[in-house]
């Protein structure tokens, strides 16, 4: 029997195979799991740079920014400081993507392939955002982690808190992209 909400699972939860890329992109957050995965991929030789991004976050007030928090995790996991690019102003996923692209351009890093490391329930919105902001010829690979919420594609529908989180992502996708759909940059 098919569960009627499998289509939501398919929409929200994205994970692809990972191949070598030019950079590992890490949209900011206040949990260590995404930087731990990025460091793991870095050490396995998947990309020469990690670009964590994010500005101030009251949940990690010990740090000036999500970037500083994530950078410290990376360094503690053996990632060389010069392999960690800096973007410490972003306040949301669109700014994570837009300001990341600016950092890459400023550093003259030509991006053809990128690995996006993010929370599992944030993966569709994060991927769509980076795809809209970055040039269309950039190929994205998505590697997800389970954060402290424990929400995954296999359990999001089992309790109200997890369901609310996933449904919130659907609402955010609608808000983020309603104006992008009719006026996207076109691939020729």
Please report, for each region that a protein language model flagged, where it lies by residue.
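Short, highly charged low-complexity linear segments
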Residues: 154-162, 182-188
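A polyampholytic, Gly/Pro-enriched intrinsically disordered region
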Residues: 73, 157-173
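A conserved mid-domain beta-alpha-beta active-site/ligand-binding segment of alpha/beta enzyme cores
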Residues: 167-188
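A structural signal for short, hydrophobic/glycine-enriched beta-strand patches
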Residues: 1-157
């Amino acid at each position: 029997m098919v569960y009627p909400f499998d289509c939501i699972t398919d929409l929200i939860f994205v994970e692809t195979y990972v191949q070598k890329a030019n950079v590992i992109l890490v949209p900011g957050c206040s949990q260590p799991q995404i930087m731990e995965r990025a460091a793991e991929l870095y050490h396995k030789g998947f990309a020469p740079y990690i670009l964590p991004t994010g500005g101030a976050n009251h949940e990690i007030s010990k740090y000036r920014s999500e970037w500083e928090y994530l950078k410290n995790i990376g360094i503690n996991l053996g990632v060389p400081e010069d392999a960690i690019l800096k973007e410490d102003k972003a306040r949301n996923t669109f700014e994570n993507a837009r300001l990341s692209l600016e950092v890459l351009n400023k550093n003259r890093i030509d991006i053809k392939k990128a690995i996006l490391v993010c929370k599992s329930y944030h993966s569709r919105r994060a991927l769509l955002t980076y795809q809209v902001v970055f040039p269309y010829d950039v190929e994205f690979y998505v590697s997800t982690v389970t954060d402290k919420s424990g929400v995954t594609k296999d359990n999001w529908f089992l309790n109200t808190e997890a369901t609310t989180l996933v449904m919130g992502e659907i609402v955010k996708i609608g808000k983020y992209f309603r104006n992008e759909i009719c006026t996207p940059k076109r691939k020729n």
